[in-house]
């Protein structure tokens, strides 16, 4: 059972990003000017508009990679950087909120930032220990050994 813990963690972490981007893509495709609205949403948090296609690409492609266990080390580093960017974005966004806003808004942003910092740490750990059960990386490595 212990060897499958990495698999479970990998699938759940990958699913977090993959399912999230599916909902975002559904919004983009179904809403009038959905992509522009997504860009504006990101820019309202202080991220440049170019982050929209990068975010879609990272979550979609690397989410699938992580679920399948393909290039686990690289994928983990990509998601670690992505998570750190989001954590810092939420922390910096806290400073741009007027003081008359409810304290719960600050708490919400703080918690989101801390959640992304936790993901950052988890992805760094996964990058340090990329050997996991039932991954495409292991299948490829076993085929190379047989040749």
Placement of each model-derived feature along the sequence:
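Generic signal for short, ordered secondary-structure residues
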Residues: 40, 63-64
């Amino acid at each position: 059972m212990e060897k499958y813990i990495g698999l479970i963690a990998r699938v759940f972490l990958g699913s977090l990003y993959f399912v999230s981007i599916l909902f975002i893509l559904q919004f983009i495709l179904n809403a009038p000017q959905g992509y522009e609205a997504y860009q504006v949403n990101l820019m309202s948090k202080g991220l440049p508009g170019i982050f929209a296609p990068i975010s879609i690409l990272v979550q979609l492609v690397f989410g699938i990679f992580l679920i399948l266990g393909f290039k686990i080390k690289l994928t983990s580093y990509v998601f670690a950087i992505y998570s750190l960017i989001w954590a810092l974005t939420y922390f910096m966004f806290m400073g741009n909120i007027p003081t008359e806003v409810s304290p719960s808004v600050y708490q919400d942003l703080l918690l989101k930032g801390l959640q992304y910092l936790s993901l950052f740490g988890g992805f760094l750990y996964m990058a340090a220990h990329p050997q996991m059960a039932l991954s495409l990386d292991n299948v490829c490595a076993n085929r190379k050994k047989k040749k």
